[in-house]
Each structure stands twice: as structure tokens, then as C-alpha cells.
Amino acid sequence: MILSDDDILARLETQELVVEPIDDLDMQIQPASIDLRLGEEFLEFQRTNISCIHPNRKEEVSEYVSETIVSEGDEFILHPGDFVLGTTKERVEIPSDLLATVEGRSSLGRLAVVIHATAGVVDPGYCGQITLELSNLGTAPVALTPGMRVSQLVFTELTQPSARPYGAARDSKYQNQTGPQASRIGEDPEFDQTDDTAQHNKENTT
């Protein structure tokens, strides 16, 4: 069951669901979602002389991105073909019986601005700001202003609370994140850190 506006308001009032700060409840609550605003921090992807990015090598990932902070009232220009990581202004706490999904606002979509590439799911139990995967699919630069409404959060009620909500156990590497976070896929259990380090050292000595 997808929560309606009244359902969302009731959850917010009892603090079963946390979305904060909300400066204008009437403007941000939609018929079956809540609008989230753009934060001030961005991670931009740089051109690099690395032949390819190995997702499990933190130093390569960190070399690939740089942080930009845009004060509220100023603009971040998203150029055609650009892909950057942004963040929501709001911090959320999703209860264990809800699944949230991030959707782009239609008005931005009509300007060819996409809010997420693949990561549209916010797991039950997640706490923190939400990283946005922003891209411009159009032919003209688009000015984005921190504080503007850029996405919608839709809530689906589970048939029963999750037995292992995000943050309770395994693989919760983005729990309580603030600001946009670059990929930490290298922390996934399928990557053997010992083997990777040995291979990396071997490459550096050849």
C-alpha cells in the first residue's frame, strides 16, 4: 500500500517517520509523496589519467571526484552530458515497515534533468540524507539552486516490518550519511580486499 498525504502526515506527527527539516509542510506534502529539496554539496566527476576505475579501489574512486559547495541563493550549473552527485537538504529516518522510493519531479524531467540513475530505493531502517545522481540529458545547461524542490519521496507499506532493516546488520555502509557520498562498493563482501591489495602492489612493481 502506498501512503497517501494523510498517512504521511500522521506518520510525521507521531515521528514514526522522520523527514527534516520541513520548512513549508503545505508545499512539500503532495497527494502521495513528499517533496525533497536540493542540498548545497555536490561531487563532480573529474577527467582522470587512470585507464579505468576499479570500483573496489578507494584511492581511484577518491581521485575521480571533487567536492563543490554552493551557498543557498547561488547556482550550480549542470551542463549537457554532465553527471554529478548531489544530496537532499532533508535527512530521513525510514521505519522498518516502510520502503521509500526517490522519484524526480516532472517539471525538472521536462528540462531533461534526471534525479537518479539507478539508486531509487531507500531501504527500511535507513537514516541520513539521500544522495542524488543528477544528470542533464538535454542540450542546454540547467541552473540548479540549493533549496529548490528536486525530487519526491514515495512510501510503500510492507506487509510486515523488515526482519533485517538497513543499519541493523550487514552492509549498511551509507547509514547516517551526510552530504553526497561517492561509491563505496569496494566494501561489499564479494570484493576480497587482500587479493585486491596484492594485485595492486603487483601492478605497481611491473
UniProtKB/Swiss-Prot annotation:
Pathway named in the protein's UniProt entry: Pyrimidine metabolism; dUMP biosynthesis; dUMP from dCTP (dUTP route): step 1/2
**Assembly notes:** Homotrimer.
Of which family is this protein a member? Belongs to the dCTP deaminase family.
**Protein task:** Catalyzes the deamination of dCTP to dUTP.
Spans annotated as Disordered: 164-206
Name of the protein? dCTP deaminase
Reported EC number(s) for this entry are 3.5.4.13
**What InterPro entries does this protein's entry cite?**
dCTP_deaminase, dUTPase-like_sf, dUTPase_trimeric
Catalytic site positions = E133
Its GO biological process annotations read:
dUMP biosynthetic process; dUTP biosynthetic process; nucleobase-containing small molecule interconversion
Per the record, what are the reactions this protein catalyses? Answer: dCTP + H2O + H(+) = dUTP + NH4(+)
Residues bound to dCTP:
R105, S106, S107, L108, G109, R110, D123, T131, L132, E133, Q152, Y166, K173, Q177
- Any one GO MF annotation of this record: dCTP deaminase activity
PANTHER family noted in UniProt? DCTP DEAMINASE (PTHR42680:SF3)
Q: Where is the composition biased (Basic and acidic residues)?
A: 197-206
Swiss-Prot/TrEMBL keywords: Hydrolase, Nucleotide metabolism, Nucleotide-binding
